[in-house]
């Protein structure tokens, strides 16, 4: 019996198919708020399969191993010129392999049988996020590495390099700015429509369990950098593009995907003001930011 579970994130439906007998209760818990049972067509389906050895499904031609910290991202070239992917906790070898057939919307992520209990959640999470960015790019949809809070019905997105203090700044708003809640703490999604940009909660929120199926109009995007003072400035369009673009997940080796992302970022920055906040991790930083972004 097929163990298929369907979800909608930012209006895009996808499925996750587990091996028969494998429980979704713990493995797919972050996805529960996004679960659906309807007839809408799925963009893609991910199937989890277990093998004795990953070498039986992995290409021997490794093109790249990317990222400065886990999860490490592997790119393999197949004999037919297509790509497959891997994810791992270390740079020694991939812990799972993702195959994305060009002629089908069903992909497969493989884990070893002896590592399935430990690695299944890791494999599914990383594979689904990658597939989501692939398949939603043509629909003005961007997954962003950011922390987002909702305040009085609007979303405020904080960008920055790892360790800059995105989550810390969100917590400062939660602690000091009334009527504020956390929407997502690691991988929110922006979707652009004709006259507005919306930001959505997702099942992917990093170390913070914040899986909210809600969306709000995106009111501001703020890139953070650490400083011994608190100062904020609005960015010009070119600066805004350069600020948002690197934070977006994308298949950067694919010209078509990159073209879609460029257009989506351009649309976003024409609708949403972008800022640079040089700041300390203190209450004043939240208030300086609040006063600037709500003045628009």
Label for each model-derived stretch:
Residues 165:
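Conserved glycine(s) of the Walker
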Residues 1-157, 162, 172-181, 189-296:
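A noncatalytic interaction/capping subdomain that flanks phosphate/NTP-handling catalytic cores
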Residues 169:
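Hydrophobic positions on the alpha1 helix immediately C-terminal to the Walker A/P-loop
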């Amino acid at each position: 019996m097929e163990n298929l579970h369907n979800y909608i994130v930012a209006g895009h439906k996808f499925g996750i198919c587990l091996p028969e007998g494998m429980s979704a209760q713990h493995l797919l818990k972050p996805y529960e708020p996004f679960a659906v049972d309807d007839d809408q067509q799925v963009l893609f389906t991910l199937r989890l399969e277990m093998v004795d050895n990953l070498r039986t499904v992995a290409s021997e031609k490794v093109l790249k191993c990317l990222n400065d910290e886990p999860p490490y991202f592997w790119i393999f070239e197949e004999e037919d010129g297509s790509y497959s992917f891997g994810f791992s906790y270390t740079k020694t070898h991939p812990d799972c392999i993702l195959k994305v057939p060009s002629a089908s919307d069903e992909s497969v992520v493989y884990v070893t049988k002896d590592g399935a209990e430990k690695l299944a959640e890791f494999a599914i999470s990383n594979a689904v996020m990658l597939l989501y960015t692939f398949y939603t790019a043509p629909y003005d949809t961007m997954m962003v590495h950011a922390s987002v809070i909702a305040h009085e019905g609007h979303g405020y997105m904080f960008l920055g390099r790892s360790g800059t203090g995105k989550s810390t700044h969100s917590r400062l708003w939660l602690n000091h700015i009334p009527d504020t809640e956390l929407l997502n703490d690691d991988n929110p999604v922006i979707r652009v429509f004709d006259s507005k940009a919306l930001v959505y909660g997702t099942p992917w929120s990093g170390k913070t369990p914040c899986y909210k199926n809600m969306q709000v109009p995106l009111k501001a995007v703020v890139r953070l950098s650490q400083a011994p003072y608190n100062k904020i400035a609005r960015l010009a369009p070119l600066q805004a593009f350069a600020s948002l673009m690197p934070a977006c997940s994308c298949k950067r080796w694919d010209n078509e995907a990159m073209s879609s992302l460029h257009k989506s970022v351009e649309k976003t920055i024409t609708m949403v003001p972008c800022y640079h906040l040089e700041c300390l991790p203190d209450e004043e930083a939240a208030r300086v930011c609040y006063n600037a972004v709500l003045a628009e």
